[in-house]
Amino acid sequence: MEPCEGTVGGATKKPKPSPAPPIAALGDDFLGEILLRLPDMASLASAALACKQWHRVASDPAVFRRFDALRRPPLVGFLLTDRGDMPSPYRSPNLFFVHATRNPNLAAAAADGDFFFEDLPAVDSDDEEEGYDWDEWRLRGCDGGRLLLSRGRDGLDLAVYDPISRTAVFLRPDGVFRACTHVVRYAIVVDEADGSFLVIGFDFRGAVFSSRSGKWVKINMERVKLEKGDVTYEHEIFDKIHSFSSDGMAAGRFAYWRSNTKKDRHFNPVERIMVLDTTTMEWSVITAPFPAGESYCVADMPEHGGLCLFSSKEQCLQLWVRNSVGGWVLKKDFSLLNEWMKKIRRAEWMKRVRVLAARAGYVYMEFWSIRKANSYFLVLNMRTMKMSVFPNNPEDPHRGPAFPFFMRLEPLLGPDEDQNVHLDV
């Protein structure tokens, strides 16, 4: 009888498999790629507690930003304002907060949040004028879980407020801007990796405050980069900069201000956007590729070269990207009208889509009607094209600036620190 296969000459001992390399043998780059595949922030926080190397890699700003960009942003809700931001009258806008999360941790944070900044101290004001609330805090911007607030006739008393932890940083740009009634236009940009922030402002001059240095740095607004061929605009740079009468918004590493040019049947107006790249500190003014009056936002999309635009045309969403020579190209154009939106459009006269923000593959919009105060907030996943809907039912319309509010993520703690990491969102 033939011997069974594998038994010739007696039994043989199987070789032992090579031992797995120790954790310490993994290079930082390879370990970073592994950490990027973890499912959520809670898992990343747990990994950061494993050892010093894992904490160093997990808390590296480059890894942290990539991890955050690959996952759904921790949306808590939408902070709405009425027209209180208009040049006249100078008053604090009325606020309204719409809860917009189904995550229990985020919902709990929203329930305890001071989104109307009622815990900030009220001070006596020397500016007494009937009908004006100079001593009230006024919302000027929002990014990374922080609110930028101002008060006083000149709007130069500033606060950066975290409504979840109810902590604030107070600052005043003494000697930077003129003391003139609400002339300065502001914006705030928060670094998600470490929680540091920049406050940007400009009137006849520009300045940036960094929380890392604790100082204001003046910027020469005459060095604003203009689009090639816009000769007329170059001669009118002084006047045109001051046509940006509203506060700015944040979009990743960019801060931007919209001219909000209105449609006019008597001439062909254009919409211009002033942009500050906070990595290079370069200012520029660009012309929007769509007609004036359309709703839009700026987006920071590295996969499309950085600065991009999302605009709405009726109930369609358009993505604009830059080509090799700096011109605008329509990358995507698709209808938002699913069966639900068609039904709402007929039943509630909802026809307008306001684009609020775009972040990490998600676009945040408001579906509203000029006839009614209520609306619906839409969160579109650009990868799956699935859309979440959150109803908004206020008594009065809030058509001023609106801000998606995202949970501010705490820095990752190391294995030798005795505090827990609160990133379970």
Write out the residue ranges for each language-model feature.
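N-terminal entry/capping and adjacent linker segments that precede and initiate structured domains
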Residues: 1-425
